[in-house]
Amino acid sequence: MSFFSKFFTRDKKETLDQGLEKTRSSVFEKITRAVAGKSTVDDEVLDEIEEALITSDVGLDTTVKIIEALEERVARDKVMGQQELMDMLFEIITGLMQHEGGLWEDFELPKTEGPYVLMVVGVNGVGKTTTIGKLAHQFKQKGYNTVLGAADTFRAAAIDQLVVWGERTGVPVVKQQMGSDPASVAFDTLQHAVSKGADLAIIDTAGRLHNKTNLMQELSKVRRVMDKVIPGAPHEVLLVLDGSTGQNALLQAKAFAEATQITSLAVTKLDGTAKGGVVIGISDQLNIPVKFIGVGEGIEDLQLFNPQAFASSLFNK
């Protein structure tokens, strides 16, 4: 398909297909069994489709929206064969994941005055620092002069892990000692980025949701300080979520969205889980674009998200 040649190499499509294998088994194969041999879509078929969507962590609200859209189409067309039904599901699901201006066709930065600033948030254990390391690699491969800021200062391990990623990717890391003021680290990082003529600064921040008020105040301070160094920074606030936690990822996303303005999402650890349907629910419920998905452990396996490619992989197209 010309579509895939535009967004993916064959290797990337294979990686995506492999990464979504368990979710595809959970969604596509169950739906296929539900509609096999049926010339009409009755309540039993709709119930089985609903169950398949819910068990793959699409979420109740989004599942209801999908089923209602199907019911409306079935009522209008009266008779719908298996392929027509699958095509309609594909269209509905793809539509729920599309957001205006949310799609990047490549790892290419928007043009800004000075360095482009990407602030990354997320709780411990979701793959936040790993995502930053993989992003640094991808952007460096594109020729962007990148710097990382270790502003998750509440865990020594977070600083150390980012330093390791910096060494692995050949990207400098600005850091202070554990317990330092995160805003101070962000300030130093952006000053370094400006002085070195960097194209991109990625700031790792803490994500301690147990006290939302403190988190809100901390992130607000970081943002204010960055804006003083580079007006308009951060240009992007990326929330990293663990896709293998299913609906818990959606709850986390809602909590973070209440604490600070989130402009995009990265959903990690989709390989090895049958809960990849949560990407559909998150895209629909939050109205925040998913920009990146993690579909493997390799450094290249953080992919740009594309709704049509994701749905095509789920539906084995």
Predicted regions and their residues:
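Disorder-to-helix initiation segments
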Residues: 1-17
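Short beta-alpha junctions and helix-cap segments that line functional grooves
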Residues: 3, 105-106, 135, 251-253, ...
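Primarily NTPase-proximal linker/entry elements flanking Walker-type ATP/GTP-binding cores
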Residues: 17-151, 158-178, 186-203
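Short hydrophobic/aromatic residue motifs in ordered secondary structure
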Residues: 60-62, 155, 271, 299
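Short beta-strand segments
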Residues: 121-122, 204, 240, 294
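Residue-level signal for short, function-critical loop segments
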Residues: 152-153, 243
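Conserved catalytic-core segment of NTP-binding enzymes
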Residues: 161, 178-196, 210-316
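Short glycine-rich anion-binding loops that position phosphate/pyrophosphate groups of nucleotides
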Residues: 206-208
